[in-house]
Amino acid sequence: EHIHGAPCGVFWHSALNGDGTPNGYAVYDVEGAAITDWRYKSSLHDESFQIRLHRGGDTHSGFTYPYTPKTVIANVWNADPEWRVTLCENGVETKAMTLVTTYTDAWSVGYHVGVLGRGDNYKSPCKHMYVAEPNDVRAALKVVAVDRWGNRYEQSEFTAPDDFTDARSPVY
């Protein structure tokens, strides 16, 4: 079972859903009666954009993640139990990241509640958040996610605290 993010985000108030997933839709490839691939397509990004990175100590309009500043947090919105999500340091895969499903996306909540002033009903549990602490915090960090079909997605850019440029609803 998969529940995908909505193309309207949080009731058209932003370009992202309450769990941090960007507005978008699912794309399924089907051959006969079999699904041969599926992926999430953000409305404002290309299909390679599957991961958003945060640092554990960052504050987003008053909301933080419950981790130390050296923790790498990866929101991998289309992930399911068959995905493999790993942390790389200086180009070398160093460890598998741990799935945590008990927290909300502090960046999304920071925008919806902290910036827009929406109520607590704009908080959604995030069931696709991964965490890991690097061995060397000075290393060049990258998260690599490989889905059940073998598609590989990478992200090395961290979202800066209170940078909500990507969250704002586009003007059509």
Predicted feature locations:
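Long, low-complexity serine/threonine/glycine- and acidic-rich segments characteristic of extracellular
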Residues: 53-172
